[in-house]
Amino acid sequence: MTAATAGIDDVKRINDWLDGAHPSDAIRWAVENVTPGRLIVASSFGPTGMVNLHLLAQIAPQVPVAFVDTLYHFPETLAHAERVKAHYGLDVRVYRPAASREAFEEMHGERLWERDLDLFHRLTRVEPMKRALQGVEGWITGRRRDQSDSRVALAHVELGDRIKINPLTAWPSEDVWSFIRANDVPYNPLHDLGYQSLGDQPLTTPVSEEEHERAGRWRGTERLECGIHGLT
């Protein structure tokens, strides 16, 4: 199945089925229905992404994993990414906006996010993700309904230019962490320090128990998304 051949009725039927299924079923469905070689997993190695990767390693370890290294991640995030690659042996492909932070800042200046946040995210996140999606028919993400108000109606399968699969959309954070602990899934140590959703180091803060897990991203602004998931 491709985005060109899938219909609205197909997607509704699949979503109805996945509402009562395990996330592994969504990953198997993607592997079996997207053209071989044209499916990827997009991951920044957050908690939900780690559940996806744990399941992927069991179901279809040949599927590539696309990681956007913005050049501004926490050092702990980059170290965690290396541990994950070694732990699961997955085909992790890294996409960057430039060869190094120094090269990026030579082109665009320092602290671009303070001058133009939209441009900063377009250059460091959206453009690298566009490259990762070239030739891709389907991509698996780690988005969930309870992550923020902007995701409360998120379906398991979305139809756009490509098919987007969100295996854990219905899982609350508690279920994600229960799975991580029960299966010894590696996770970023910053989560133990109150960081729930990890983005760029200059733009990310810890959150309180009362807040959405993405409340620490772009604190003090009304922004909820970086722009990657505007890509379909």
Regions from the language model: what does each represent?
Residues 1-232:
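Nucleotide-activated chemistry modules centered on ATP-dependent adenylation/adenylyltransferase
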